[in-house]
Amino acid sequence: MNIGIVALLILVAVIAIGFFRKLNVGVLAMAAAVILGYVSGDYTTKEIVAGYSSSLFITLFGLTLLFGIITTNGCLEQVMRRLINVFGKMMWMVPVILFLSAWCVSALAGGFAGLAFICGITIPVIHATGYDPLMLMIIGNAGAQAGRYTRVSPDGNIVLNLLAKQGIDGGLMSLTINMTIAMFIIASLAFVFFRGYRTKKTGTVRLEIEPLSPKQWVALVGLVIMIICIMALGLDSGLVALTVSVCLIAAGVIDEKTAFHSVPWNTIIMVTGVGVLMNMVITSGGIEILTKVIAAFTNSVTASGASCMTAGIMSWFSSTLGVVVPTLTPTVEELVEEIGGGLTQIGLLSAMLIGSSSACFSPASSVGGLIISSIAGDPILRDGFDNEKAFATMFLWSVAMVAVSSLLALAGIYNIFH
């Protein structure tokens, strides 16, 4: 059997085992790569190890370490609380402010940081406004999904790394615009579906704030320096973030043990580990095979919609960053060349990532699960909250939004900005 087909089948098996056994897909992928490499005899030890991207590790480690420090320090949350309070008297602006604040946090610190921020910040907002809890959570997390793929965020750098391997330079600005358009539509649909316009908008949102401490000011200065170095000077994001992190630790902003504890090692291992197996899938011709299969069943009109739906389905059973992104992103260049027509690289990539993000509202995913658990865990909201109904609602919402995103892809919306 063709080694490329074998590599693809092993990738599918790794994803399935990780899902059903609740194991880290990255560790499974590395073990599978070792077995495939040695048993097939087609790969040396050096070639197997070459699949582990040290540059991606440094990028993820540096950025997640810095934003772990920022998050633990609490400076960013205090800034966002002040922003929300500025518009506290404009009740109709609350959903918009939640969307934008989550977008900003996610654009800086990545999707999961945006998710954690919005789930924590939304509960007191729900108490003050009377808006439907699920509605505000969906709107806030749509904002977090919209802003996650920037040059500064860990998520954006993962995509940037995968695009660079295909010779595609940049594209994150267009991707972020497409993500924002799609997630704004999803947020708007949530506002209509949950009848946010019928909520009695009286009172004022006033979140509790504290004066920024000297350590929080230092952390904010470090964050600003990092953004300037990356966006204005074009320096490497991982190296800059790592350097700023070390300076903050040395300055006593946070102790070293707490800083390293804040790093999501499980996610880093998952993303970089899958890369080892994906390197074999690529070098063995597996991506070419996968591309030809997709191209055989699609054309320039349907490719984006089909890719969006495929990514959404994959995301119901696996991690976006750990599986969907490293599996589908490498197919972008070859799919565009194979299918042609009006298909664009960033347009196709946008369809894939938007489909995956649209599926994240499922209660089986980290986003949907955290939304439900955050509401159910609140002593005020839990009394009138039906867990089973919320579970069904979130799952159906996830399915519906994948369908909506796929229709937008079919309409060519994601090819406007490419």
Predicted regions span which residues?
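Hydrophobic alpha-helical transmembrane segments
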Residues: 1-11, 40-45, 118-135, 209-220, ...
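Small-residue-rich midsections of specific transmembrane alpha-helices
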Residues: 60, 356-369
